[in-house]
C-alpha cells in the first residue's frame, strides 16, 4: 500500500524555493518532500533516472578505458568524464543526504517577526525572493542553452577519434558515430534505429545531467542569498533599534560625557547639552539636513511616553522603576525589540551552519573535480590552431566550468562580507544615546560578530573569491607541469 504525500501550506524557505523543489522532483532528483503524489512512485521515478544516468556514465568510462593509448584522445575523454562526474556525484549525494536538505529547508519554516520591524523584514524578504527567482531562471535558461549548443555542434566538423598506428607510431583519425558524446555501446550505434536511440538517449543524458547538477547548486546559492538578505535586514534595523531605545528612555544622559578626556590637565570644554541649557541657540541645519538624519521616522509614538502608574498621565515613572527610567511596558517594548534582533541573528547563524553541513562535502568534491578538469582544459587549449569545432568545444567547456566555480564563490564571498559588516553597523549606530541595556546589547553584538560567517568545503577550504583565485593559481601550476612533461 502506498502513501500519498499531499502538499500543505508552506512558509519560509520551502515556499520561496518551491519552483526549484518542483523542478528537482520532475527532473528525477530525490527531492520528494513538500510535493504531492505517491511516495513510492516518486522513488521509482527517481530510481529509473539514476539507472539511466549510471548506465550512460559507465559507457563513457568504458570508452575512456578503450581509447587510452592516444594522449589527446585520453585527455578529451577524461574531461568529458569529469564533467559528468559532477552530475552523478550530486544526484547520489542528494539521495543519500535527503534528511539534511529537508532539515535546512525547514529551519526557516515559521514566520517570526516584530511589529516595529515587520516592514523591513518584508522588504528584505521580497528582495531575497526576487534574487532567488532570478537566479533560478537564469541558470535554467543557461542550462537549456548549453545543452542545445552541445547538441548543435555535433553536426559540425568531422566525427572521428584519434588512435595510435603501431606501425608508424603516429596518431590517425578513425570515423565514429556522429553523437554528442564519445561513448561505447554494446550495439552498433553507427546507423539505423540504434543510432536514433543512442542519439536521443545522449540528448536526454546531457540535458538532465546538467539540470540535476545546476538545480542542486541553485538551491545552495539561494540559501546563501536568503541568509545575506537577512543580515541586511538586521543591519538595517540596528539604527532604529537604538533610536527606539533612546526615545523610550525617560533619562537622557549627556552623550558628550562619554567622550570626555580622562586627562586631569585637559582644558577642553564639553559640548553643551541643550536639555540642561535650553537657552543655547545652536543652528543644526548645517549638520543634519533631513529628518532621516535624526531618525525621526523611527521614533516611537508619543503615546509610549505617557505610560505610568497614574492612568498614563504622569511622567512615566512608577515606584520601583528600573535604573534606566523606563516603565514596565516601555521596558518590555525595548527588550522585545532587542530580543527579536538577537533571536533573528541566532536563527541566521543556525541556517548558515546547516547550509555548510548539508552541502560542504559536495562542494569539496566539486572543487577537486573542477581543478583537475580545468587543468586538462588549459592543456587542451594549447592545441587550438584556429576557429573551428575543436576551439568552440574547448572554450565552451572552459567557460562553463569556470562559471560553476565562480557561481559558488561569489555568493560565499558575499556571505562573508555581509556577516563581517554587522559589527560595523552595530558600532556605527547611535548606541551612546540608547539605554544601558541597549549599550550592553551592542557590546555583545560586536563581540559575537567579530568572526564572519562562512561556508566551508568539508572544513578544507572557505568558499570565497579567494578560493576562486586559488583554483586558478593551482590550474596554472599544474598546467605548467603538464607542458613540461609534454
Curated annotation (Swiss-Prot):
InterPro entries: 7tm6_olfct_rcpt. Its main location: membrane. Keywords: Behavior, Cell membrane, Glycoprotein, Membrane, Olfaction, Receptor, Sensory transduction, Transducer, Transmembrane, Transmembrane helix. Residues 1-47, 97-135, 213-351, 412-462 are cytoplasmic. GO terms for biological process: behavioral response to ethanol; detection of chemical stimulus involved in sensory perception of smell; olfactory behavior; regulation of protein localization; response to pheromone; sensory perception of smell. Glycans are attached at residues 169, 188. Odorant coreceptor which complexes with conventional odorant receptors (ORs) to form odorant-sensing units, providing sensitive and prolonged odorant signaling and calcium permeability. Orco is a universal and integral part of the functional odorant receptor, involved in the dendritic localization of other olfactory receptors. Expression of Orco alone leads to formation of rapid and transient ion channels not directly responding to odorants, but directly activated by intracellular cAMP or cGMP. Heterodimer with conventional odorant receptors (ORs). Complexes exist early in the endomembrane system in olfactory sensory neurons (OSNs), coupling these complexes to the conserved ciliary trafficking pathway. Belongs to the insect chemoreceptor superfamily. Heteromeric odorant receptor channel (TC 1.A.69) family. Orco subfamily. This is Odorant receptor coreceptor.
